[in-house]
Amino acid sequence: MGNLISTCSFSSRVNSTAKITDSSIWYPQPDQHISIRTFRELNQAPTSSPTSTRTEMFLNGVLSRSTDDLQGEDSRQPMTLTPRQLTQDVSRRLLM
């Protein structure tokens, strides 16, 4: 396994207490193979598993990419939510 590369982004709304943190971890592999795992945290409560895995590989000058959604079809949410949608989504998830 190669060197660890990590990124993190944070977003929140002025009128909401909800905070979302996205972080990605890269493990470059031999032959320029990169595995990316993305985690999402809501109000800094850690998730138990990655939400998606993306793999990029360069072989003979050709880039090959694949993305696996590890949450399934039912849990896919739009990436852009209005403050009202975000509040409703957070409330629904907290009441589950």
From Swiss-Prot:
Regions annotated as coiled coil? none
Q: Which UniProt keywords apply?
A: Host cell membrane, Host membrane, Host-virus interaction, Inhibition of host innate immune response by virus, Lipoprotein, Membrane, Myristate, Suppressor of RNA silencing, Viral immunoevasion
What are the GO BP annotations of this UniProt entry? symbiont-mediated suppression of host innate immune response
Checking Pfam families in the record gives: Gemini_C4 (PF01492)
Q: Which InterPro entries is this protein grouped with?
A: Gemini_C4
Predominantly, its location class is: host cell
Q: Which GO terms describe its cellular component?
A: host cell plasma membrane; membrane
- N-myristoyl glycine lipid attachment residues: 2
Q: Which domain of life is it from?
A: Viruses
The residue ranges flagged as biased composition, category Polar residues, are 77-89
Q: How does it sit in the membrane?
A: Lipid-anchor
User: Into which family does the record put it?
Assistant: Belongs to the geminiviridae protein AC4/C4 family.
Query: What task does this protein carry out?
Result: Pathogenicity determinant. May act as a suppressor of RNA-mediated gene silencing, also known as post-transcriptional gene silencing (PTGS), a mechanism of plant viral defense that limits the accumulation of viral RNAs.
Q: What is this protein called?
A: Protein C4
